[in-house]
Amino acid sequence: MSEKNKLAEKLLYAPKNGYDRLSAEDEKAMEAYCEDYKKFLNNGKTERLCVEYCIELAEKKGFKAYEAGMKLSAGDKVYFNNRGKGIMLAVIGSEDLSHGANIGAAHTDSPRLDLKPRPLYEEAEMAYFKTHHYGGIRKYQWVTIPLELHGVVVLHDGSKVDVHIGGKEDDPQFIINDLLPHLGREQGKKPLNEAIPSESLNVLLGGKPFEDKDCSDRFKLGVLQYLNAQYGITEEDFISAELEVVPAGKARDIGFDRSFIASYGHDDRVCAYAELAGIFDAVSPKKTAVCIFADKEEIGSEGVSGMLSQAFEWFMGDMCRTQGVALSDCFANSFCLSADVTAAYDPNFADVYDKRNSAFVNYGVALCKYTGSGGKGGASDASAEVVGKVRKLMNDNGVFWQMAEMGKTDAGG
């Protein structure tokens, strides 16, 4: 090797495609991991379903439900179910919590359509649900695609029923109508974010009337008759329901080489599953390992199941109390990775990316030093020390990684 090449290899940063670095054994392990990830996506279409599936997997790995004041020893595995919408898991370390914990945090809620409190109506002899979109959806992506309905309904007597329609092969599914091209001239002149108004995101439910020709609202009543027979639901019960409309279908491999996965919910279940797999592999950690599945990130992390609640502090604080440790001491010595998705460079939309500071497909996990928009507005900006620690950790353990921002400074954030 020439002196020039030696110097270039020593001084220049030259990321490489992961496929050029993977051994055959590593590639086989990666493919097995992706198959398990697809199962997670298929079983976790909503934040509630993610929690249920997480508990199912965790209990198979020896995790037990955490109870207040529970005495824990090194190696114990516990989970705390936060109202069925969030979950935290911990593997107790050999050091007490005064030395802190290593924490991974991701969210399992994804953009979707929620039903309004009084959603059911009929118009032009068809039955519909009114929706209120949750999080930052691209509205045009939600019309004319098959949809599923998942959630819970608390009935008038206080009992709760689970509703899951559209996920099984023989289930009916739902759809939101759009204009046909022949009548869409004026719609086509509108900006993309205005062409499909939020109030037009009405889910088509059916067009078969109730048998009695003399009753009013025959089509609405036909839907209620079905829901009452299957679930015991009346119209008033929608007021105390959490019903979510999500895209139908299972995760699928994409490409002749099956090198991509298409699915609803990558944001942020791709990170949630990674940290879950990580804590399942944690064996006799020195510091306690903690995994967080948070809810409500898409709308600001509010509410009792979001990260702005006291749920995480309660879980950590209660474990600290059993060890006689102050929660503040634990947090002062803890380390946390907040895991969420970013945007990989897409040549079809190259104008919104800073190519030199973008993530690229197959170049490894994307690390983002800061978030925010514009001039780092609202950013969480990691220090050089934190980035250096994570960078060294990745390199020392053979993890493929890359640094990334989300697009050009003025493009969004």
Show where each model-derived region lies:
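N-terminal hydrophobic/helix-forming segments and targeting peptides
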Residues: 1-413
